[in-house]
Amino acid sequence: AGLTPTVRDVGPFRVSEAGGIAIACGDVFDLEHLDMTGVAGLYDRASLIALPEDMRARYAETLCATLPAGTRGLTITIEYDQALRAGPPFSVGAPEVHARFGTRFAITQLCDDDILSDNPGFVAAGIPWLREHAFSLGIKPTSGMS
C-alpha cells in the first residue's frame, strides 16, 4: 500500500514525511536551516557528480558539518577520463570520495562496475571507459564527532 506524505515548508526546504521517513527537497548549501537531529541516512545518487570540483568541496564540507554523529550514507559516482568530456556529470573516483569524506566517515567501496555499454552518450562521445562506483559511508569509530 502506498503512503500519503504530509508536506510542509521548513525555511527554504519542502519536506515530505510518511512512514517515519522525511525527505527534504532544496539546496544542500542551505542545510543549516533544517533541524538535522534524527537524520540517520544520506543517499547521493547524482549530487556529487553534478557539481564542478570547487562546489564538490563545499558540498562535502556542508554535509560533514551538518549531519549528526552516527549518520550513515550511500554515494554513487561515475568515473571516466574527464579530459575527454566536460561535465556534468563530472568524473569522481575513489580517491576523491576518500579525500572529501574520509575525515568524517569510514568509507567502503561496494562496487566498481563497467557501465560504458549502458551509456550511449558516452560511447558516442568517444569515451573509452566509464565506471560506476558505490561507496558506503559508515560511522568512523574514533571520529570524536558529536
Give the label of every model feature segment:
Residues 26, 43, 51:
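A conserved hydrophobic position in a structured secondary element of the catalytic/binding core
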Residues 34-42:
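A short acidic, Gly/Pro-enriched loop at the edge of an enzyme's catalytic core
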Residues 1-35, 60-146:
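Class I (Rossmann-like) S-adenosyl-L-methionine-dependent methyltransferase catalytic domain
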Residues 21, 38-39, 47:
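Local beta-strand N-terminus motif with an aromatic residue
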Residues 48-51, 87:
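Flexible, glycine/proline-enriched loop segments at strand-loop-helix junctions
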Residues 50-62:
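A short, conserved alpha-helix within the catalytic core of class I
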